[in-house]
Amino acid sequence: MNRRDFIKNTAIASACGVAGLSVPSSVLANTENKWRWDKAVCRFCGTGCGILVARQDGKIVAVKGDPAAPVNRGLNCIKGYFNAKIMYGEDRLVTPLLRVNAKGEFDKNGKFQQVSWQRAFDEMEKHFKKAYKEKGVEGIGIFASGQYTIQEGYAAAKLVKAGFRSNNIDPNARHCMASAVVGFMQTFGVDEPSGCYDDIELTDTIITWGANMAEMHPILWSRVSDRKLSNLDKVKIVNLSTFSNRTSHIADTEIIFKPNTDLAIWNYIAREIVYNHPEAMDKEFVEKHCIFTTGYADIGYGMRNNPNHPKFKASEKDTVAKQNSIILDDEEAVSLAYLGVKAGDKFEMKHQSAPDAHWEISFEDFKKALEPYTLDYVAKVAKGNEDESIEEFKKKLQELANLYIEKNRKVVSFWTMGFNQHTRGSWVNEQAYMVHFLLGKQAKPGSGAFSLTGQPSACGTAREVGTFSHRLPADMVVANPKHREISEKIWKVPAKTINPKPGAPYLKIMRDLEDGNIKFAWVQVNNPWQNTANANHWIAAAREMDNFIVVSDCYPGISAKVADLILPSAMIYEKWGAYGNAERRTQHWKQQVLPVGEAMSDTWQILEFAKRFKLKEVWGETKVDDKLTLPSILEEAKAMGYNEDDTLYDVLFANKEAKSFKANDPIAKGFDNSDVNGDERKIIGSDGKEFDGYGFFVQKYLWEEYRKFGLGHGHDLADFDTYHKVRGLRWPVVNGKETQWRFNTKFDYYAKKAAPNSDFAFYGAFAKELPKGDLIAPQTQEKYSLKNKAKIFFRPFMKAPERPSEEYPFWLCTGRVLEHWHSGTMTMRVPELFRAVPEALCYMNEDDAKKMQIAQGDIVWVESRRGKVKARVDFRGRNKPSKGLVYVPWFDENVYINKVTLDATCPLSNQTDFKKCAVKITKA
């Protein structure tokens, strides 16, 4: 086909698309006959949709849903169809950029100038080594990502934890899934869901809690909608939210509740079961498979515990002071009365250092703790729409409880950020399991509490790989000596290499930058300066402190703009990779095209940086803090055949085992691999020479080494080649068979192995020995085994630390919209998505707006005690807040809403609550 025919056929196809007509098959055939289609994975949310991508002339030219993909069955959401266009924005980063002065020297106050990869790594090396020498292993920090490929995350964690002996690496998944992780670990003793997406087609009831699935998980919502339409009378949908949204459109019931009162609603449902419908309780299931537990309530809110910190403005201090104590109001006093307190009391946060401590209690104590959560009390504290009558709200709560309680009704509870981004996010995750366990509706086809993931590999990379600051792969943790020993053996490094002290979580890395305790930070595959609450502090920390900030990215987002060095990163289909989705499904893809410009993969950047460090520079005796010094392991390294002049690259990534994975592997035939073979761009690498590849199949090596961590104990993954032949597999994968429902002996090999004569086995090993106590505290020193059992937690209702007041009368909630992904770094570069939603709006109640003489489309200030931004008001659109609440998405850097939000977190998970702070709205 010549150029004229190509243009003609393309024009016909475009015209037909605009007119809504089908395209003649002959035109499609002519247009596509030179395209190469291959399977891949969507770049966006945690749903894990399979897609087909087409390549022609070195570019991705088309994307469509993969009909063979079991997750999405050929459908894409609006973002998914633009997976190709995110790669070709006009301001794509194509070369390293360094801040320099007029002489070309690095200058933190200088302007960005193009530099070579060699110059970029020279500067990185210099500033890293300076920070490492001055501050030790805690003087550096890595902002990691739930958008890393699995291999990238594994390489990063291995370099930091085994190479640098630091645990200061933490992913942006800390912002989205950490509370879910704690909920899983504390309840089941192991991470990730027991169920799978198949539950949607098998259930009778879908209840969403703080999960606007219609916009945030639209493909799953299409499956929910299909299930609803299959049996309109039987299948029920309830949407619980702090504001009305698109998920309510097909819901049978919408329940609008006040922020944080989901805690009270769960306890109301549990009370209904225990007090009013004891026959609904699955006593056999509970007695065989569960124990009752509780923990401390006086744990703070994850803020700094010094309200007089010199970086705080005067307006911030009152809120921060609540980290140490609060004055109980009438409503909170009722929920905490079991602790012997009353309204007006000062409630001191005495257990800030032990937020995750918990112990076994009796069923009688559990029942006693639920007693205050009557329908009258919960309706009073939780009703979120002041225009709704209390009787109507009570009726909805009763209907909700009845749906859960109905004996033969299958129920799935879905949640996302409304639960997880919560100062008691771990608690509310535990409460969901509480109700499902009481009813015996967990780990069964069509029934279960199910945490939906936000990012494409928050499960596969952040959680399973262990890029969190306290974790190692396969649910292991750095504080456990047995886990360190296992990891050191797999990594082939000396004993005592791994630092036993957990590193700084994401927000603490920011605070340590502000305090001058971290001098070097490297950002990969995320945008922390846009996505972290109370952002004015962190902008100042990046620009005004003596530190060096490196950002690897594909576009110049806010984080890149505050950086000292920017590295251009390859995007998803410009590299080999794998993601793990919310239902434990792992999916791999091949590199389809070469990266643009001089961009290189994050794996390449990690390995090239590793070449800059000799063992003698990082494996000597190292002081961590006043209580911990890491011993020198150089002699042990020599005994293992290493030389002190070997680099971390030689030992960790280019060892004998790695080089056994041949570059000319048959699985790679016909596909580029820029990391392994170099490519036609002839990139001048970090050593100033042309990079012609590592010469071994590094991605396959990283995968096969990583999967060793999970084999044999319930985290089994298939081999590399298998994933390239299938549309993903749900782990554990045992004898080639995936697992749909964990802990159920009919479906889970490990459950059957743990308890061959039982229906269920909750075989997770974490925190499975507990003392016994009452509602106040543990009463025994001795710990008792909970082998194969899960925990039913009692957790009290507590309010958010900052609530509306006379000066700041509105709740602020943040989140996403359908058309954009996270901070908009990619999707705002897609013309069609930008035209659809060009700016973040301030959604507010129409009556509130009219009362303030604010019209549709007016520009207002959204202001908190921390900062303010301008936004355009909308009260006619997709989101309908009740009076007293506004909703502002965070994808738009021109509406920098995280300057306004509060950096309070769940103390157990360290996950930020982006959903609740107090603001005032004024005309701009």
UniProtKB/Swiss-Prot annotation:
Substrate binds at W890. One of its GO terms (molecular function) is 4 iron, 4 sulfur cluster binding. One of its GO terms (cellular component) is membrane. InterPro entries: Asp_de-COase-like_dom_sf, CT_Nitrate-R-NapA-like, MoPterin_dinucl-bd_dom, Mopterin_OxRdtase, Mopterin_OxRdtase_4Fe-4S_dom, MopterinOxRdtase_cofactor_BS, Periplasm_NO3_reductase_lsu, Prok_molybdopt-oxidoreductase. Its EC number is 1.9.6.1. PROSITE patterns: 4FE4S_MOW_BIS_MGD (PS51669), MOLYBDOPTERIN_PROK_1 (PS00551), TAT (PS51318). It catalyses: 2 Fe(II)-[cytochrome] + nitrate + 2 H(+) = 2 Fe(III)-[cytochrome] + nitrite + H2O. SUPFAM superfamilies: ADC-like, Formate dehydrogenase/DMSO reductase, domains 1-3. Belongs to the prokaryotic molybdopterin-containing oxidoreductase family. NasA/NapA/NarB subfamily. NCBIfam families: NAPA, PRK13532.1, TAT_signal_seq. This is Periplasmic nitrate reductase. It comes from Campylobacter lari (strain RM2100 / D67 / ATCC BAA-1060). The lineage of its organism: Bacteria, Pseudomonadati, Campylobacterota, Epsilonproteobacteria, Campylobacterales. The gene is napA.
